[in-house]
Amino acid sequence: MTAAVKDEISRLPVTRTCCRKAEVSSILRFAGGLHLVSGRIVIEAELDTAMAARRLKRDILEIFGHSSELIVMAPGGLRRGSRFVVRVVAGGDQLARQTGLVDGRGRPIRGLPPQVVSGATCDAEAAWRGAFLAHGSLTEPGRSSSLEVTCPGPEAALALVGAARRLSIAAKAREVRGVDRVVVRDGDAIGALLTRLGAHESVLAWEERRMRREVRATANRLANFDDANLRRSARAAVAAGARVQRALEILGEEVPEHLAAAGRLRMEHKQASLEELGALADPPLTKDAVAGRIRRLLAMADKRAQDLGIPGTESNLTEELDDSLVG
């Protein structure tokens, strides 16, 4: 899915100048390098998609006023696909200062430039967009799903973690075999970050694959009922569904919508776990929140039934399910 995300965000229109500057600065930091050629600074950025390279070349010209050349490197050696190098020779030293690759005295800046680090939320989004275009990857949803960016050093990694924090997204910096990386593993956080990057089509595709995988995993668990604990959990879930059905009958239109929604989820997915119900909720809920809402729904219905002198929620239980508990 990495290629799909990069293709989509390479086509994303960005109009605010500060965001375009932040994106260029980030791409040059994560995909680029400074070289001294005949005493002059030459800037190079190596990308794996032509669309991202053309976007960078255009923005360098339109925002910073510098021409660049685009060099295509054919596959060979360890490279499976073509690589695209954007090179700035004339004005390289000036561009290095403009984008925060070096400070006013010409000393290299290891992380992201101050104007990006302390910028607005849109600058943090742009920094992540640039970093992902430069060296990002997204794995398929599953146990080891992750969104990851390879970083040029620990300072850049920490700056990217800080940018994620400003977007309320948990990311971790780690060093693996001498390479600094920033990783986002939580499924919800990955979806939120992709949305922030502007990869809306990719978010839908990723979430759909994630949901299909979870449904398959649930089906496999339900098909393998050798484990007694799993059987008890499933019976308890079915029992809760039966009690919820009776609760909704008792309360009718008096039930609060958020409790009714939790109850309907329990009825529609009788053998799902509370965690799975939470993932199906809109917006998603924790398993404790789902359990709490179902408990309140049943308690409200049983109190109402007692006041009216009619059978409560447990009247819907068969003998087999009579001892089961919610979820």
From Swiss-Prot:
Chain spans, region Disordered: 308-327
Q: Which InterPro entries match?
A: Homing_endonucl, Sporu_reg_WhiA_N_dom, Sporulation_regulator_WhiA, Sporulation_regulator_WhiA_C, WhiA_LAGLIDADG_dom
What does the induction field say? Answer: Autoregulated. Expressed throughout vegetative growth and sporulation. Could be post-translationally regulated.
Q: Which residues bind DNA?
A: 273-306
Q: Which UniProt keywords apply?
A: Activator, Cell cycle, Cell division, DNA-binding, Repressor, Transcription, Transcription regulation
Disruption phenotype annotation: Mutants form unusually long aerial hyphae that fail to initiate septation or chromosome segregation.
**Is Ribonucleoprotein tagged as a keyword?**
no
One GO process term, biological-process aspect: regulation of sporulation
Indicate whether ATP-binding appears among the record's keywords: no
Q: Name one GO molecular function term.
A: DNA binding
Q: So which domain of life are we looking at?
A: Bacteria
Q: How is its activity regulated?
A: DNA binding depends on WhiB.
Where composition is biased (Acidic residues), the residues are 317-327
Q: Which PANTHER family match?
A: CELL DIVISION PROTEIN WHIA-RELATED
Q: What job does this protein perform?
A: Involved in cell division and chromosome segregation. Plays a central role in the initiation of sporulation through the activation of multiple components of the cell division machinery. Acts as a transcriptional regulator that is involved in the direct control of genes required for key steps in sporulation, including the cessation of aerial growth, the initiation of cell division, and chromosome segregation. Functions almost equally as an activator and as a repressor. Required for DNA binding by WhiB. May function cooperatively with WhiB.
Q: Hey, which family's this protein in?
A: Belongs to the WhiA family.
Q: What is this protein called?
A: Probable cell division protein WhiA
Organism expressing this protein natively: Streptomyces venezuelae (strain ATCC 10712 / CBS 650.69 / DSM 40230 / JCM 4526 / NBRC 13096 / PD 04745)
Its organism's taxonomic lineage begins at:
Bacteria, Bacillati, Actinomycetota, Actinomycetes, Kitasatosporales
